Design a protein with these regions (language model features):
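Short, glycine-/polar-rich solvent-exposed loops and beta-turns at beta-strand/coil boundaries
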Residues: 5-10
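Internal, well-folded beta-alpha domain core
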Residues: 13, 17-189
């Protein structure tokens, strides 16, 4: 089965509701520079030698909660994407390192037949959601929108193009139900 092109996927309209912003955390990492079974090992150099330990800081977002919606005229495409998230062939990760999502990246009741904004506004909010949440929507009209140079054009060559986004604030419920229950319906914009 052939998957959609980057251009087809770029044609989808995306919206993100940020229920919890989370916090930025740092993970200090090292690679190589040690010994295993008495033999030195590490990151190989072109001449066959070894680099000393490579140290780096990796930044990631912890304890955040987002609801992402996609909209398209092609319902079959949305169903294929939804099915791919529900039954992935490879392990899913967030970012360039294997940061695995703590919950499945799809909702069992997430494939809905509504416009994008009402669907994002009307879906129950996550536990501990902020009282007011940010909603980021892709726009085709640059008027009143902010440019972003992160629209994938070519994954192989890591080329990106411009897209436009609009940010709105959405007020929601101020009291949450305990015990992992979902919150009440939010106010719509």
């Amino acid at each position: 089965m052939r998957w959609p092109s980057v251009a087809t996927l770029a044609g989808l309209r995306m919206g993100v509701r940020c229920d919890r912003s989370g916090t930025v955390a740092v993970d200090f990492q090292t690679a190589g520079g040690g010994r295993m079974n008495g033999l030195a090992y590490g990151v190989a150099k072109a001449d066959g030698g070894l680099f000393p330990s490579v140290m780096s800081n990796r930044y990631f977002l912890q304890d955040a909660s987002f609801l992402v919606g996609l909209s398209a005229d092609d319902q079959r495409l949305l169903e294929r994407l939804y099915g791919a998230l529900a039954s992935p062939v490879w392990q899913l990760y967030l970012g360039r390192k294997g940061y695995v999502p703590s919950v499945p990246p799809y909702l069992s009741d997430g494939l809905v037949h509504r416009d994008l904004v009402p669907a994002l506004a009307g879906y129950p909010w996550a536990d501990r959601a902020d009282a007011t949440v940010r909603v980021v929507l892709e726009e085709t009209d640059p008027l009143g929108a902010e440019p972003r140079m992160d629209q994938p054009v070519d994954y192989e060559r890591r080329r990106f193009g411009r897209r436009y986004v609009r940010i709105e604030m959405l007020s929601g419920p101020r009291t949450l139900l305990g015990g992992g229950a979902r919150v009440s319906e939010p106010d719509t914009p």
